[in-house]
């Protein structure tokens, strides 16, 4: 799926707002993901055996959260370019062995959309939920085609 220049600008702007406090945003995303889907926590080696409340301040969790958010940053940077397909293939290859499939990417997208919405609401910034939801549907489909 291709996104308009305005949509790309919107998601990148929202993303910049989130990265102002990347650690807090990352913890919130994973908190939402695991609250909604507790069984997903076992798919993350860095999070196994940790209470969701213990993610914050755990060096292994922090490292993995930054990796995940870095991957999202790569996707946003590659929107509407051929590089996006390369990223999708890589992510599919990295996640399939752990059973992280299209549905898990959709659910992660929902957690990210909720966290971004909360962050934008607190800062008074605009948030285009429909564009973000379309983006994560596209991401899940893009990765899913290689699994």
Swiss-Prot record:
Adapted to the low-temperature environment by a decrease in the oxygen affinity via an increased ligand-dissociation rate. At 2 degrees Celsius this hemoglobin has an oxygen affinity similar to other hemoglobins at 25 degrees Celsius. Heme b binds at residues 64, 95. This is Globin. Homodimer or homooligomer. Belongs to the globin family. Residues 2-147 form the Globin domain. Keywords: Heme, Iron, Metal-binding, Muscle protein, Oxygen transport, Transport. GO terms for cellular component: extracellular region; hemoglobin complex. One of its GO terms (molecular function) is oxygen binding. Pfam families: Globin (PF00042). InterPro entries: Erythrocruorin, Globin, Globin-like_sf, Globin/Proto, Mb-like_M. It comes from Aequiyoldia eightsii. It comes from the Eukaryota.
């Amino acid at each position: 799926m291709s996104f308009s220049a305005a949509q790309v600008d919107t998601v990148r702007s929202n993303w910049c707002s989130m990265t102002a406090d990347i650690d807090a945003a990352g913890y919130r995303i994973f908190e939402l993901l695991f609250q909604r889907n507790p069984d997903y926590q076992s798919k993350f080696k860095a999070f196994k055996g940790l209470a969701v409340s213990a993610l914050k301040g755990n060096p292994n969790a922090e490292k993995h959260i930054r990796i995940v958010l870095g991957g999202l940053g790569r996707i946003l940077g590659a929107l509407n370019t051929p590089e996006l397909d390369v990223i999708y293939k890589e992510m599919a290859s990295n996640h399939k062995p752990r059973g992280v499939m299209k549905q898990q990417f959709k659910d992660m997208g929902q957690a990210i959309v909720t966290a971004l919405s909360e962050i934008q609401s607190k800062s008074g910034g605009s948030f285009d939920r429909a564009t973000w939801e379309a983006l994560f549907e596209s991401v899940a489909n893009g990765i899913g085609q290689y699994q």
